[in-house]
Amino acid sequence: MIGKRAVLLCAFGSSDIKGIEESIGILKKDIEVHFNFRIKVEIAFTSKIIVSKLHKKGYAIRDLEGSLQQLHENGFEEVIIQPIYMMDGCENLKLREVVALYESYFSKLIIKRNLFGEEKDFNKKAINETAHIIKKYSEKYSNILIAGHGSKINDNSI
């Protein structure tokens, strides 16, 4: 018998509530629909400063540690963590360090790969899929800003 399962979408965070709802919130709903609402899907931010700002605005969200603790306390046995980082950089390393502290809490705790987690991912298909997503949203919104930043680790090879 399969125990209670959850997907935890993990990002650095944003203090823009509308931005959260129109990005990672949509992804959360899509995953819930995909699994016919049989799997709990939650969002966690790794930035404690962002989480604190959101709490002051009355927006309920947990940091990664709080989410893992809550899932454990609620009897979840299998948790899939999907980082919402483009590449395997510093934030992903921090995520792995935190997750390692909670491995014994669950029968299965898996961290999935980032969109461009490995060099083999820098291929035409992945780039075309990313371009398709941008095109889809450009039909609804007149302006789209794509932003990113570098990393001090070697995976910053894009």
Model-flagged regions — what are they?
Residues M1-I158:
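Extended amphipathic ligand-handling, pore-lining, and cofactor/metal-binding catalytic surfaces
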